[in-house]
Structures are given as structure tokens and as C-alpha cells.
């Protein structure tokens, strides 16, 4: 088991993290190439202030919430925060980043990190419940939506259990290996699934350049097509 742990911490972590970085870079290159090819010099005439303002408004997307999906959308928004902050700022993770990058990055206190981890787990469970039991969300959900939520839940739950022996049902080595492997599976999946939007948020939200839409037009078009059941 120790050999597997060392492999998961070392070569496998490096390989899967590299796959994620290269995959995300590929998506950025494709989007930038598409923009420059299709728009060319017209990019200089694009309404950049409106586009950037619209993208920034999604950082706290209160005005984008559509009636009937407010609770689901709010939980989804909060989940995204936890899904970014915990992997980047948890003290054990920061120690790993510092070892790899040779930096001295700040980290969350362990107590705060525990609460944020539990909060993120609760958000994932809530999203699963909504997709399962709310008819309008169930009809919009595909099998991949459920699978991805479960896969996202695994590294958070296993990491918390590994750090807290009193709630850990498995030997520490087994739980830590589960944590590492589930996280590394997500590394590989991120560039090839909708999980990429968590990382490429800004690039997703400036797609108005492609269509030369007025600010808020995307929301209005989606609501006109799909009504209140549109995904937010």
C-alpha cells in the first residue's frame, strides 16, 4: 500500500496534473484561435467594457437567477467556490504546491478548511438531491451529471475522512489512496467534461464576442427558448 501511495503522490500526480493543464491550455488556444479567425480586426471594435462587465457580473450571479431555480442555482454557485478554494488553499494541499513550485503560498487554517470541506460536500449532496427529486431538474439532467457530481464528491469526502480518524471507516492508507486516485481522476476528466467551466469560467463568459450579443442577451435568449426551466 505504501508503494501505491508514493506512486499516487509522485509520478501519477504529476502526469494527471500535466494532462489537465495541457487539456485546459488546448481549450483556451482553440477558443482564442476561433475568435481571431472569425472576428479578426473586428475584435478591436468589440464592446469590451460591456463584455467584461457582463463576465464580472457572473462572479456574484444574483441578477442571472431565473425564478424557479434560485435555490438550486445558489447552491451550485456556492459549490463552485468550495470546489476551487479547498483544493487550492487546504494546508496539506498548499504544502504539496509549495514542494512542487518552490513557493511559500498561504493556506487556510485547518478548522476553516474542515468547515469549507463539509460545506462543499453538503452542496454536492443538495445538488444530487435536487437533480433526483425535482421534476424539472430531473428531466434536464443526464446520466453524466450524476456521475460527475459523485466523482467530485469522492475526493472531498475521502480527504475529510483521511484527516479525521474518528469518522474514517477504512485504514488511513486505503482512504488516502482513495482520495489521491479520485482527485487525479478528476484532473484527467476536467478538460474533457463540463468540469472545465469551473477553471475556464472567464473564457466561457466572454463568448458574447463570438455572437456580438448585447449584455444579458444570452440570458434572455435562453429563457425565451427554454422558459424558467433553463439551466443557470
Residue ranges and their predicted role:
Residues 1-232:
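Membrane-embedded alpha-helical bundles that constitute the cytochrome b-like, heme-associated redox core
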Amino acid at each position: 500500500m505504501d508503494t501505491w501511495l508514493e506512486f499516487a503522490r509522485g509520478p501519477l500526480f504529476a502526469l494527471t496534473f500535466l494532462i489537465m493543464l495541457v487539456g485546459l491550455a488546448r481549450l483556451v488556444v482553440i477558443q482564442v484561435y476561433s475568435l481571431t479567425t472569425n472576428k479578426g480586426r473586428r475584435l478591436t471594435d468589440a464592446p469590451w467594457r460591456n463584455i467584461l462587465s457582463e463576465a464580472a457580473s457572473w462572479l456574484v450571479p444574483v441578477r442571472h437567477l431565473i425564478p424557479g431555480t434560485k435555490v438550486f442555482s445558489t447552491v451550485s454557485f456556492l459549490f463552485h467556490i468550495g470546489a476551487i478554494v479547498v483544493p487550492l488553499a487546504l494546508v496539506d494541499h498548499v504544502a504539496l504546491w509549495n514542494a512542487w513550485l518552490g513557493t511559500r503560498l498561504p493556506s487556510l487554517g485547518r478548522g476553516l478548511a474542515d468547515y469549507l470541506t463539509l460545506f462543499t460536500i453538503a452542496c454536492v449532496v443538495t445538488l444530487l438531491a435536487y437533480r433526483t427529486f425535482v421534476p424539472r431538474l430531473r428531466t434536464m439532467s443526464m446520466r453524466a451529471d450524476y456521475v460527475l457530481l459523485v466523482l467530485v464528491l469522492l475526493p472531498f469526502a475521502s480527504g475529510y475522512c483521511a484527516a479525521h480518524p474518528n469518522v474514517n471507516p477504512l485504514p488511513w492508507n486505503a482512504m488516502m489512496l482513495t482520495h489521491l486516485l479520485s482527485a487525479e481522476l478528476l484532473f484527467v476528466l476536467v478538460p474533457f467534461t463540463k468540469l472545465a467551466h469551473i477553471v475556464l469560467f472567464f473564457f466561457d463568459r466572454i463568448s458574447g464576442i463570438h455572437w456580438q450579443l448585447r449584455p444579458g442577451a444570452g440570458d434572455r435568449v435562453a429563457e425565451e427558448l427554454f422558459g424558467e426551466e433553463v439551466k443557470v
